[in-house]
Amino acid sequence: MTKNIETDILIIGAGPVGLFTVFEAGLLGLKCHLVDNLDKIGGQCIELYPEKPIYDIPGVPNQTGKEHIDSLLKQIEPFDYKVHLNQRVDKIEQSGDHWIAETSDGITFKTLNIFIAAGAGSFEPRKPPVESPDKFLGKGIDYAVRSVDKYKDKDIVIFGGGDS
């Protein structure tokens, strides 16, 4: 099923930058739609480190990833926006003075402005080379720390590099 939506701004990414874009656009009276591949608003702040303190937000000594996203959501409450989760933008093309963007769920957006706030992109864990690793998900294998209490006073093993 194809759905057509006209909006002032299409924002790709519903993390902190996408949410702040809603705020700035809202101050100008513009209507926004956000599209995100994740199943919830907040990007990496929610997906990877909801309980981890963040120290480099201007004017905020520290707050967790969840607190940061909650603050941004509170800030944009008065504004006109809609969120489309579990979708990605598969195609963008220019049509006259507008942009046409199509999502994986069959939504077609017509807009004058597209703001790409995709950050580091969609979080895709590198799964261990064992048979059916997802059957152990939450039972010994986790791809992100969503609650530090789950691991408190326990021995853990971390496999990986980079941000692991």
Where do the language-model regions lie?
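Short amphipathic alpha-helical segments
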Residues: 22-24, 46-47, 126-130
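Helix N-cap at the beta1-alpha1 junction of Rossmann-like dinucleotide-binding domains, i.e.
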Residues: 38-41, 122
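Glycine-rich, phosphate-binding/catalytic loops in enzymes
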Residues: 27-29, 50-52, 131-134
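Short hydrophobic core segments
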Residues: 10-12, 108-121, 159
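Rossmann-like dinucleotide/flavin-binding elements
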Residues: 3-6, 10-39, 137-164
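Glycine-rich beta-alpha-beta "Rossmann" dinucleotide-binding loop(s) and their flanking helix/strand
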Residues: 105, 114, 118-144
